[in-house]
UniProtKB/Swiss-Prot annotation:
It comes from Shewanella sp. (strain W3-18-1). Keywords: Hydrolase, Magnesium, Metal-binding, Nucleotide metabolism. The gene is dut. The keyword Calcium does not apply. Its EC number is 3.6.1.23. This is Deoxyuridine 5'-triphosphate nucleotidohydrolase.
């Protein structure tokens, strides 16, 4: 099932020099976002840069949100991850999509124009309404926190 999402092109190279975000395979969950920078840039070790993607989206449906996630190869091979770890795009946001790019490695990382930098995934949203209680019904876990369930 495909849900229509409004997309605005902010950089004219998208759709001409570089393709619109799209799913690479039938099983893909995310669409690649590209670095729509004006010139090749180097991100120094420990540095964070905000990178434009050249697009804006409007999800519009309050039952959906978008998340910007890292591409696994960049983090594993080069130490390039998202500065905010996950970018959450609310359904009513209409501004440009930007990627906070953090070089957590000890080596400079060169980013070329149009490089695939992150991925965009759409997820369902449930808006909760809190019900105030004095006590919770008991559960198997109870108040056990970090590491409570073990490692094996």
């Amino acid at each position: 099932m495909k849900t229509p999402i409004e997309l605005k092109i902010l950089d004219s190279r998208i759709g001409s020099e570089f393709p619109l975000p799209a799913y690479a395979t039938l099983g893909s969950a995310g669409m690649d976002l590209r670095a729509m920078i004006d010139t090749t840039m180097t991100i120094a070790p420990g540095e964070t840069q905000l990178i434009p993607t050249g697009i804006a989206i409007h999800v519009a449906d309050p039952g959906l949100a978008a998340v910007i996630l890292p591409r696994s190869g960049l983090g594993h091979k080069h130490g390039i991850v998202l500065g905010n770890l996950v970018g959450l795009i609310d359904s009513d946001y209409q501004g440009p999509l930007m990627v906070s790019c953090w070089n957590r490695s000890n080596s400079p990382f060169t980013l070329d124009i149009g490089d695939r930098l992150a991925q965009l995934v759409f997820v369902p949203v449930v808006q909760a309404q809190f019900k105030l209680v004095d006590e919770f019904d008991s559960s198997d876990r109870g108040e056990g926190g970090f590491g409570h369930s073990g490692t094996k």
